[in-house]
């Protein structure tokens, strides 16, 4: 231990201390602070409390619920939709007696003809690479010819070597099932918490200030979720089908954050104290039940584990969990009597369906835009209720390249899809997404509360985003979702609030 605990005269440290040159004048001479004394700021007095509140209208799958926020505190900060999701089990009407339950067919079947996830469409994409004689070949020969055709396609399109069959466990093959589950099963779709919130709107004084959609909720978490703080269990996210099935068998409470502007930074918290004459409402539209579940066969019906009855739209329960901030009298009076403005971030959405591999979208966005976020979803994934799967053919990038035009002038030269999926998030976001989400940021730091760059699309007549998709996607229908995050100003006057700039 002597070698580890040997002493020192400290002369080396002193040598470093006096070794000063001309360049040190830029580093440490006339210092303005020290690392060896804590400097802090005093803050105003406050307290926080998280309060749950039921919706004012009925909650059900496929319905819109509305809530008027109670004036429990002076400010509103964090906000969650709390979903009480029932456990579900599968009952095969062809194999057992499912008392009091109608025949199946309500939910998509995983791996049937219409939902294989996109395997048939992938085969169509490589059809030009298949050797002659495929139709007359035996089933084994057909599989071999398909494999050879895929290898040619990979070499031609991606410069890739032959594909490998390297799935040897459940983690590598997420669709392999634990044998103990048997052949009859049902599960909630992945990330079901976020998917359930089809649309959430915040309404102040009868006017919608901002709207969030489930695709945006998923994309925003992928871009901003930080290590150790990913939502995973909060929203029902899993990585294998076995995990999804096992989780779905029990009742769960999910917490779905709503990333409105006032939840992102404390300085932008929504001041109820400034809204004596305006109410704040949250409207949440929930997804339809048949879009939320996947089953093992057409004859399967889904039962609520708590009641043993067929799952119904009104089996959904939800409330809103809101963090209220309480201020002392002086600061509360300041909010109540002062006229002021808050810089906020809104979200705009564009959606289109196409069967063309060359997509030209005219984006009718307004206001100074911080960034554009987009994704592509194949119809064959939608048929499987695989809603947040934005992958293309062979689980590759669906976007080959992208270009942006402002008034028919190129904003930047066409760049590969991977540049928008990897480099842009690396430069401007907290996280590089695990899936095929694409970003172009006009701001240096689009997650911050302070402006760091934008493009005022209200002053541009034509904004065109051109995407070159994989060639094979031109043979099927795909959905393209584009979201724009923009700045606006919320003005508070005489107990009322409204946007300074309308669309």
Predicted regions and their residues:
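Short, low-complexity Pro/Thr/Gly
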Residues: 1-118, 128, 152, 166-503
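Intrinsically disordered, low-complexity segments
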Residues: 112, 136-137, 161
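Non-transmembrane amphipathic alpha-helical segments
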Residues: 122-130
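Generic surface-pattern signal
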Residues: 131, 135, 154-155, 159, ...
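Charged, low-complexity interaction regions
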Residues: 133-144
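Repeat-associated, polar segments at repeat-unit boundaries in modular proteins
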Residues: 142-165, 169-170
């Amino acid at each position: 231990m002597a070698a580890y605990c040997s002493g020192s005269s400290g002369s080396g440290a002193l040598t470093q201390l006096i070794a000063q040159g001309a360049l040190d004048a830029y580093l440490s001479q006339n210092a303005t602070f020290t690392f060896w004394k804590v400097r802090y700021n005093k803050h105003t007095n406050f307290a926080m409390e998280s309060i749950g509140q039921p919706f004012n209208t009925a909650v059900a799958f496929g319905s819109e619920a509305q809530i008027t926020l109670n004036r429990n505190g002076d400010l509103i900060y964090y906000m969650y939709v709390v979903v009480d999701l029932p456990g579900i089990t599968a009952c095969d009407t062809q194999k057992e007696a499912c008392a009091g339950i109608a025949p199946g067919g309500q939910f998509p079947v995983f791996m049937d003809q219409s939902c294989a996830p996109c395997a048939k469409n992938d085969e169509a994409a490589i059809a030009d690479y298949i050797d002659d004689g495929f139709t007359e070949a035996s089933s084994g020969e057909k599989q071999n010819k398909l494999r050879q055709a895929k290898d040619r396609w990979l070499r031609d399109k991606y410069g890739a070597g032959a594909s490998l069959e390297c799935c040897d466990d459940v983690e590598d093959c997420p669709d392999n099932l634990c044998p103990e589950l048997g052949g009859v099963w049902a599960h909630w779709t992945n990330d079901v918490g976020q998917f359930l919130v089809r649309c959430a709107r915040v309404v102040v004084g009868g006017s919608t200030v901002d709207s969030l959609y489930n695709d945006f909720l998923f994309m925003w978490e992928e871009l901003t979720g930080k290590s150790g703080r990913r939502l995973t269990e909060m929203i029902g996210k899993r990585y294998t089908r076995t995990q999804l099935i096992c989780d779905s068998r029990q009742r769960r409470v999910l917490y779905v954050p709503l990333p409105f502007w006032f939840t992102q930074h404390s300085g932008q918290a929504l001041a109820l104290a400034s809204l004596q004459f305006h109410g704040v409402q949250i409207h949440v539209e929930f997804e339809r039940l048949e879009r939320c579940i996947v089953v093992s066969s057409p004859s399967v019906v889904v039962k609520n584990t708590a009641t043993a009855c067929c799952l119904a739209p009104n089996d959904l329960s939800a409330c809103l969990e809101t963090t209220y901030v309480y201020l002392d009298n002086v600061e509360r009076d300041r909010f109540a009597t002062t006229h002021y403005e808050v810089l906020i971030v809104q979200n705009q959405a564009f959606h289109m369906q196409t069967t063309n591999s060359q997509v030209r979208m005219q984006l009718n966005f307004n206001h100074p835009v911080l960034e554009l976020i987009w994704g592509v979803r194949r119809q064959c994934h939608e048929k499987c209720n695989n809603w947040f799967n934005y992958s293309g053919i062979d689980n590759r990038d669906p976007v080959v390249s992208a270009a942006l035009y402002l008034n028919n002038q190129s904003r930047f030269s066409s760049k590969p899809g991977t540049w928008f999926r990897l480099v842009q998030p690396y430069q401007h976001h907290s996280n590089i997404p695990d899936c095929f989400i694409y970003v172009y940021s006009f701001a240096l730091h689009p997650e911050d509360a302070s402006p760091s760059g934008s493009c005022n699309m209200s002053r541009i007549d034509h904004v065109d985003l051109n995407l070159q998709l994989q060639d094979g996607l031109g043979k099927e229908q795909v959905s393209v979702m584009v979201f724009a995050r923009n700045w606006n100003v919320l003005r508070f006057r005489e107990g009322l609030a409204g946007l300074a700039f309308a669309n």
